[in-house]
């Protein structure tokens, strides 16, 4: 305290002139001096410690951001400053190397964390979720190994509705758990055209149909005669069939024969329709020429029967396929 007072007196004497005290200039300089001291102290306390970002809550690199030994960055203290239920986008890049990519990024308190991770190694990006917050992940390596440890890979920009991933792609000839980022040889998440790209622009409770647009996943009312079912690439959709009885011939009293038709019978539509069972994740599409599976954001598990191009499927915990159900028109 004595040192500060002595400094103030010395500064005041320095600004003393023949005409008297120039108090306005003195206080202005003193205020600027305080700001400089506070800014220098804050900048020195927030410097990085390890080469991977801020040490308080961001990404704290183990061996540098682009080292080839142990991957790029691991989650810091608080989970990447998700802000408690907010939306945090973390973009981390690691150079090519052995372990490849990223260890873990902790989510916030129920917040949603977008992670765009591009590791350049064959091991892919191994990403694990944080404390309660669901993750939309764009992870994996550039080789056939693909992602590991249950990595859910998405193509391009993920769309998160109610903490659920609606934009999922597990393409790539590598197949395996979670597919891969580019698969064996291929481009940006498609591999040898093995991945199936599914995009759902509809709202909650609806599924996007390639032919008919947004369709409700609830059973359609009986009065909607011309409403088409949800298009499913895996299952066969049968078109409506109308049944008519054979015409019968009758004779008028004056001898002129005529033909008449009996009233047509009740029409039915028999097709495979997904019966909505629980409000879980949106349809997840699995691909890859080697099959494999991927987990949805709410725990639903989709599956693929493999083959070139793969097949699409819905999470088993969300939809129950009711084959052959008849809906009266």
Curated annotation (Swiss-Prot):
Keywords: Secreted, Signal
Tissue expression as described in the entry: Prismatic layer of shell (at protein level). Expressed primarily in the mantle with highest level in the mantle edge and lower level in the mantle pallium.
Main location: secreted
Gene Ontology annotations for the cellular component aspect, listed alphabetically: extracellular region
Subcellular location: Secreted
Residue ranges, compositional bias (Gly residues): 49-80
Annotated segments matching region Disordered: 38-80
Keyword hit for Signal: yes
UniProt signal peptide: 1-16
Positions with biased composition (Low complexity): 38-48
The protein's name: Serine, glycine and glutamine-rich protein
Organism encoding this protein: Pinctada maxima
